[in-house]
């Protein structure tokens, strides 16, 4: 399977995994549309396989459902951006775009989380002002790492109090 085929396979997985039930998603039509999209991009070209998949590989490190929602929201946005630069008058492109927009609406929280991660990566950790602020935050960060989530804690406290 070529890199482009892998990427379009990921697109199919995203569409199935989030926001759609079997009755609301016509997989046969979607696969046909993706095949037409592959033809539009000439994805059978020999250079597509060079270096392996570019999107599927990124998904391997994201294991939890909430983690996957973050990365998948970015992937959906990438596909929408890719389709913005194509001929939107073609029915198959319009259909894929509509499905992706629906998925994007279901994954809208991921963009904010990715922005937070990028903002953290941009912090100048050699800046004394950043050091001061980070030192003030350190105990709170460590507490969040040590303390169980409040919902689990509340449930376990309730079970201890209950004399069932």
From Swiss-Prot:
Keywords: Antiviral defense, Cytokine, Glycoprotein, Growth regulation, Secreted, Signal. It holds the Pfam family IFN-gamma. Its main location: secreted. GO terms for biological process: adaptive immune response; defense response to virus; humoral immune response; macrophage activation; response to interleukin-18. It comes from the Eukaryota. The keyword Secreted applies. GO terms for cellular component: extracellular space. It is found in: Secreted. One of its GO terms (molecular function) is type II interferon receptor binding. Glycans are attached at residues 42, 61. Residues 1-19 form the signal peptide. Homodimer. Produced by lymphocytes activated by specific antigens or mitogens. IFN-gamma, in addition to having antiviral activity, has important immunoregulatory functions. It is a potent activator of macrophages, it has antiproliferative effects on transformed cells and it can potentiate the antiviral and antitumor effects of the type I interferons. Belongs to the type II (or gamma) interferon family. This is Interferon gamma. The gene is IFNG.
